[in-house]
Every structure is written in C-alpha cells, then in structure tokens.
C-alpha cells in the first residue's frame, strides 16, 4: 500500500524538513515502510508525488504546484533539490506501492483539479465490479478529467461530482469551500463506494473490505478520512500531530514542540515522522479529521460499520495478514550508521485526544 503525509502550518516550512531530512521521512518510509499493508511488496517504489500551495497568492489562484515521477522517491535528485529550495504552509505528499493501475505518472498521487488536491491510501474492494456504475454516475466533465487507471483517481472524480451535486462548483478559484462542504462531499463519496461495493459483493462468500483513507484540501481546509468497510477489522494506519513548531534537534532527528496551546503546526501521516511516542496520536478508525484554521476536529463516521462501544478492540487479524502494524516509533538512543528502521522500538498508539465535534 501507499503512504501519505499532510502538513498544514501557520508559517511555511521548507519541504526538505518533511520529505528528505527526517530519519523517518516519507521518503525513508517509501524505502521500507514497517506499517505498509502488503509485505509482499518490499518497498513503496511505484512513484511519488508532492503538491504544495505557493506562498504567492497570485500563483496559488490556479491551485497547487505539483511534482510527480515514477522513479522511487529515495532515488530522485530533482525531488531532493526541489525540497531544499521550496517552502509552503500546506503540503500533500504521497509515495505509491501500486495495488491497481499501471506504473505511470498519471497514476501517481496527489491528483489536482483547480484549487482542489486529493490523495488516497488503501483500495476499493472489487473495484472492477463497481467501476462501470461509478463512471456512469458522474458527469462527463469529471469522467473526462480521469487520465490514469487507478481506483483512487476515480474516487476523486466521484468526489468532484458529489461536491458539484451538493451545489458547490469544483472549479471555484478562491479555494475556500469551507469545512462543512468538503466533509459532506467526502462522507457522501464514502457512502457511494460502500453501498456499491456491498451490492457488487453480495453473492461472494468472502471479500476483503475497502480501505478508504482519503485526503482532500482546497488550499485552506483539509479533510481526511480513516475508514474501512468492516465493523470488526482495523483500518489502514493514520496518525496526527500538532504543536507550536516542528524542529530538528540533531541531524535527522525531529521533535514536535509544544510551547503553548496553539496548533501552529499540524501534520497527518500514514506513518509518524518522529521517534517521539508523545508526538503522535492515532486517528480513530472510521472517523473523519478536519483541519480548519489550524484547529483539529474529529467526527465519527456513523454507519453500519460504526462501533458504539469506545472500548471495543477491532481485530488485528486482517491488518497483520497484510503487514499493517498498528504502532508508532518510540524515542530511543540513535546509533550511528544504523538505518532508522532498524533501531526503532514500537508500541500501540495513544488514544486520540483532539476535540470530538
């Protein structure tokens, strides 16, 4: 499976502090992700992409800057150079291990449409069984927007069509749809996929659930889902961190500082960037996280797969069979010349403490 990272800051950050410099940066994760879902694929090496919103407001009117390549992220000199010379206060980054679709730049995330940016970690169950219904459902405008062959890009087209049918023009230039509109469109997109796959799989004895970790932004608000079409299984990993700053304490080692109650720095990631256990909190399974004006909101996704008992422990059997380890790095002494992924400790993530709206 893939990994993704979101940064939303009150002040801009150099992209290298997210993508290349941290010992457990998303690029190091692409080389050997310990939390990846499918251990039959040793690396997330099927391309990468990074989208960032320019600090110049005139340039940002047409949406984010986008850089993609099919080469492995850890072996792309252009990415390293770009990351050292670029700053942004809103960044989407993604490394891909393909589960559907061929290796091509058009299949690399993130995907953009005017001011909107979208990416996905996971997969749609029996996508071939619902693809025709999905494509027939959306307007030609969004059907023609699809360039690649992934389930993820089709999900984005469905999101755009859903946003349109809710009364919001996806071509809106100012990039401020508001958190309610984006969250509503995200939830309805999940509803469509859940219902269509359930119908397509009704005669199957056993099918794997859909893993729908979606992320979307309009350049202002960010909405992220952690969702699985199962009431008993765990979803793909997702964590968030917030604080007053994200600082490098020594080469490759970073920490989220909390000097006050402000959330000047917010990050959402498939896998944590730091080795400090207290830096990161697991996003609850089957919930939606919203970043609105540097404030985190968490909403449960209440449907047939919602667990009312907050103490209920979902089974890790499916996750373990796919290599999903519901854990985060622990801080410990760093030994020189030892790869970061070989010196980590692991533990279960702490309970979410963000505001539940």
UniProtKB/Swiss-Prot annotation:
> Locate the Glutamine amidotransferase type-2 domain: which residues?
2-260
Query: Where in or outside the cell is it found?
Result: Cytoplasm
Q: Which residues form the active site?
A: 2 (for gatase activity)
User: Which Pfam family, any one of them, does this sequence belong to?
Assistant: GATase_4
Looking up CDD domains in the UniProt record yields: YafJ
SUPFAM superfamilies per the UniProt record, alphabetical: N-terminal nucleophile aminohydrolases (Ntn hydrolases)
Q: Does the keyword Magnesium apply?
A: no
Q: Which GO terms describe its biological process?
A: glutathione catabolic process
Q: Does the keyword Cytoplasm apply?
A: yes
Keyword set, alphabetical order = Cytoplasm, Glutamine amidotransferase, Transferase
GO CC terms in record: cytoplasm; glutathione hydrolase complex
- Disulphide connectivity of cysteines: none
Any one GO MF term held by the record is: amidophosphoribosyltransferase activity
Subunit structure, briefly?
Component of the GSH degradosomal complex composed of at least DUG1, DUG2 and DUG3.
Protein family according to the UniProt entry: Belongs to the DUG3 family.
This chain's function reads:
Component of the GSH degradosomal complex involved in the degradation of glutathione (GSH) and other peptides containing a gamma-glu-X bond.
**What other remark does the UniProt record contain for this protein?**
Present with 7300 molecules/cell in log phase SD medium.
Output the PANTHER family linked to this UniProt entry. GLUTAMINE AMIDOTRANSFERASE DUG3-RELATED
Instruction: Tell me what this protein is called.
Output: Probable glutamine amidotransferase DUG3
User: What organism is the protein native to?
Assistant: Saccharomyces cerevisiae (strain ATCC 204508 / S288c) (Baker's yeast)
């Amino acid at each position: 499976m893939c990994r993704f990272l979101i940064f939303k800051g009150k002040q801009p950050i150099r992209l290298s502090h997210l993508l290349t410099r941290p010992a457990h940066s998303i690029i190091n994760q692409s080389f050997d992700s310990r939390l990846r879902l499918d251990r039959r694929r040793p690396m997330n090496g099927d391309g990468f992409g990074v989208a960032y919103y320019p600090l110049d407001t005139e340039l940002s009117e047409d949406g984010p800057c986008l850089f993609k390549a099919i080469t492995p992220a850890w072996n792309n000199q252009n990415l390293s150079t770009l990351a050292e010379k670029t700053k942004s206060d809103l960044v989407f980054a993604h490394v891909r291990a393909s589960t559907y679709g061929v290796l091509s730049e058009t299949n690399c995330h993130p995907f953009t449409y005017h001011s909107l940016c979208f990416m996905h970690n996971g997969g749609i169950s029996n996508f071939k069984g619902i693809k025709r219904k999905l494509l027939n459902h959306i307007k030609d405008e969004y059907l023609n927007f699809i360039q690649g062959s992934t389930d993820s890009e089709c999900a984005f087209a469905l999101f755009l069509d859903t946003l349109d049918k809710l009364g919001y023009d996806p071509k809106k230039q100012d990039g401020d749809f508001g958190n309610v509109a984006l969250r509503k469109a995200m939830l309805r997109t999940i509803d469509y996929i859940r219902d269509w796959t359930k119908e397509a799989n009704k005669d199957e004895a056993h099918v794997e659930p859909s893993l729908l970790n979606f992320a979307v932004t309009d350049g202002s608000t960010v909405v992220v889902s952690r969702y699985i079409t199962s009431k008993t299984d765990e979803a793909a990993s997702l964590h968030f961190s917030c604080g007053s700053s994200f600082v490098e304490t020594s080469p490759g080692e970073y920490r989220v500082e909390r000097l006050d109650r402000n959330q000047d720095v917010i990050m959402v990631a498939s896998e944590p960037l730091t080795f400090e256990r207290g830096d990161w909190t697991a996003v609850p399974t089957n919930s939606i996280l919203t970043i609105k004006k540097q404030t985190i909101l968490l909403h449960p996704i209440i449907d047939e797969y919602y667990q009312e008992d907050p103490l209920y422990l979902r089974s890790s059997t499916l996750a373990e069979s796919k290599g999903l380890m519901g854990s985060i790095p622990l801080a410990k002494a760093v030994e020189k010349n030892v790869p970061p992924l070989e010196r980590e400790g692991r533990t279960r993530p702490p309970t979410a403490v963000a505001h539940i709206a």
